[in-house]
Amino acid sequence: MQAICSSEESLYRPEAVRWRQRMEMMKPLGDTVVLLPCSMKKPYSNSKSHQKFRKLTRSFQELIVTSPFGICPRELENTFPIQSYDVSTTGSWSSDEVEESGKLIAKYCEGKNIVANLAGGYLESLEAFVDDFTNVCVDGRPTSNDSLYNLRMELKNHQRVNRREKTLHELRSIARYQFGEDGDRFIADNVKTKGMYHKRILSDGTQIALLNKDYGLYRLNLAGGEILKDLGIHIVNIDFDLQTNTVFAPGIEKADHSILPNDEVVVVRDNTAVGVGRAVMTGREMEECNNGIGVKLKHRLKK
């Protein structure tokens, strides 16, 4: 699915507004944040410009400035809808676009060293809300040899982040985006990943989720559902024994009101995670509806 975002009105599309709201929860890793412009090609890392940037910036916290979504930490670039939207990258921004991105930049980078390689509206959004930063861009061309040289030399003055810490931070950022502010607790210190494309997320050797590269989100296993249950996140309570992979709304006693359609949820009975799957309704609708499917299960506890 591709999200078409080609005008200023796109700022107020529900998916763009929801993304910016979730970006307010995100936290950077390390002492330095490197700000980069977005690219037409998605995910950004596949673009020629970002391949040049990444040779210099991959060991730092990277933050991509974009509209209408505001900002995108590098670790979320594969996440829907940011990985599939279509938008002009001319660099000419409206005042509303400058404001929406600028506010998020200021909040995300608070207390951090900021190294920017920006021009045009991207730079305007930074200048409007942040006073202390270093911009290495020359002649409005972030990919020029001079700009890249300046970026390389400036980053020599800043501390890189540890690879293991970076991996954990990436996994926790995705969990925070998907499950809310406490979501990063879904990823324990001992978590390991296996797989080149879709990544299996393992805790103590047990798979808790699959990180789906196509959407950049976790697909839960039952063990992961048990973790979510203990965290009190995305819970759907039922009062019957599961016999199929479909949970109908009339059998749902209570549901987390933060749940939206297509969210990953854990189905709980008698304080035990008995199933995990995808929400079809909002949590409130699950409680109020007298018919219809509430959850489609991917895994369930079988006796």
Model regions and ranges:
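Peripheral docking tails and interdomain loops at the edges
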Residues: 3, 121-166
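A short, acidic, amphipathic alpha-helical segment used as a generic capping/interface helix at domain edges
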Residues: 90-112, 250-254
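Short connector loops at secondary-structure junctions
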Residues: 61-84
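Active-site and ligand/interface coordination hotspots across diverse enzymes
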Residues: 1-55
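Beta-strand/loop-dominated core regions that host nucleotide or nucleotide-derived cofactor-binding catalytic loops
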Residues: 205-303
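Structural motif
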Residues: 36-40, 116-122
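Anionic-ligand-binding alpha/beta catalytic cores of soluble enzymes and soluble regulatory domains
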Residues: 153-231
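Short, solvent-exposed amphipathic alpha-helical segments in soluble enzyme
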Residues: 49-59, 130-132, 270
